[in-house]
Amino acid sequence: EIEFTRTMHGIMRNISHFCSRTKSRTWGKDGWPKIVVCVIADGRQKVHPRTLNALAALGVYQDGIAKNVVNKKEVTAHVYEYTTQVSLDEGMKFKGAEKGIVPCQMIFCLKEQNKRKLNSHRWFFNAFGRALTPNVCILLDVGTKPDSKALYHLWKAFDQDSNVAGAAGEIKADKGKGWLGLLNPLVAS
């Protein structure tokens, strides 16, 4: 759940940044409804229960209602949606409007079977992409902590040039407080 909350809180901080751009013709304080965060879990048995607890704390998941068979047919996935007004940081502390967090529209897709990453991408583009018809899609792996303005800069690349079909951000290792993460050889390399 720490990796999930690290990523989700980073996304929430980015949505707050979009809404802080008061001189923007696209964004501003009421810009948050233009963003939908889709979380796809690859297999009900594979997702960690504490991650589900974090999603429940955000209001987008309810434990105990998902069934694997309905009307004698196997269920492929369970879809939940909610507009949350709080975020959970890495320390599992709630952050809300008092900390600059704005509402966030969320879709949580809990796939019944673990079908791997490409299948999750297909779910995102074929199911949710067709329904939402987004102008820009940004894919993040769990554990990635986007800087507070990173998603804005990715969006801006698409907004400024209609010929841009893809963009990538820079990935940096989190060195931790006092750069203690550098004691880990994987981080240090």
UniProtKB/Swiss-Prot annotation:
Keywords: Cell membrane, Cell wall biogenesis/degradation, Glycosyltransferase, Membrane, Transferase, Transmembrane
Biological process per Gene Ontology, one example term: cell wall organization
Catalytic activity from the UniProt record: [(1->4)-N-acetyl-beta-D-glucosaminyl](n) + UDP-N-acetyl-alpha-D-glucosamine = [(1->4)-N-acetyl-beta-D-glucosaminyl](n+1) + UDP + H(+)
One Pfam family it belongs to: Chitin_synth_1
EC number: 2.4.1.16
GO cellular component: cell septum; plasma membrane
Signal peptide range in chain numbering: none
Membrane topology, record value: Multi-pass membrane protein
Localisation per UniProt entry: Cell membrane
InterPro entries assigned to the protein according to its UniProt record, in alphabetical order: Chitin_synth (IPR004835), Chitin_synth_fun (IPR004834)
Molecular function (Gene Ontology), one example: chitin synthase activity
Keyword Hydrolase listed: no
Family statement: Belongs to the chitin synthase family. Class II subfamily.
Protein function: Polymerizes chitin, a structural polymer of the cell wall and septum, by transferring the sugar moiety of UDP-GlcNAc to the non-reducing end of the growing chitin polymer.
Name recorded for this polypeptide: Chitin synthase 2
Organism of this sequence: Exophiala exophialae
